[in-house]
Amino acid sequence: MNKTIEYQKEFLKENNQLLSIPVKKNILKEILQNDEQDTIITNCITKEVSINLDLIKNPKVLYSIYIMVVEYLKSMNIA
């Protein structure tokens, strides 16, 4: 696993907000459409989505989720 992927996973694990980010389902479907074989979503209640980072194999999917979290944190004035 390269350093970028390692960093992104660590960043996401450290930012527990990931577990309660209101993710629009259509955005999530867009992110996951090419990687549906991985069981990434472990819980989906209305807009709240839980993502099991250890099940993500595709670096593009990880990067999309990483960017989404960074944008969310920026919007909350955290990052």
From Swiss-Prot:
<comment type="similarity">
    <text>Belongs to the asfivirus D79L family.</text>
</comment>
<protein>
    <recommendedName>
        <fullName>Uncharacterized protein D79L</fullName>
    </recommendedName>
</protein>
